[in-house]
Amino acid sequence: GPNGSGKTTFFNVITGIYRADTGRVVFNGADVTNATGRAVYQAGMARTFQRSRLSLPLSIFDNIMIGNHKRLNQGLWFNLVKRGDFKRQFEESYAAARALVEVFEPGLADRLFEPVAGLPMIDRRRIEICRALISAPRLLLLDEPSAGMTHEETAELMNDIMLVRARNKDLTIIIVEHEMSVIERITERCVVLNFGRKIAEGPYRTVASDAQVQEAYLGVA
């Protein structure tokens, strides 16, 4: 949908950031309407945001691990008493983070402990997606992942996302996007919003030729 159509608001309602006034949010057979963000995360959803949420002084690895707290035992007692388990969890987490990064940019795999601050925008976006993927979600929500990037960087990132999808058959990816060229290339099914309402749904070619969609984007049918 065009700017201001309600795409990000839709994501925020799904993930518990905004409360729904009416209707229900059902995920994997469970009603998660107005659930907390943590509950939604535990249910198997993960997301990225339009604006970067990375902590720039932290390393690539540390930023990715922020998304892994569902799997990690935490607390001083655990770290002090069960040091063997802590070491095992760290090694498993490191291997998982490295494997994810290698899907996007193999060169970053040997730089996991470098600060994120020195990375270009495309690599920061990659790290954000890796942080979402580290929890092994069933639903990945990407909110305008190509925002702020060049056409070349956008094409490269879309290749990465398609590779992630190909390697994770049980993973569903929903992308918020308003650039039709990106939508045409990467999507299997499109849902178009305008002023908070769904105006079209289906394959890209069907949606792109819809009179309401053309009016929403161009002002004319």
Language-model features: locations:
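Glycine-rich phosphate-binding loops of nucleotide-dependent enzymes
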Residues: 1-221
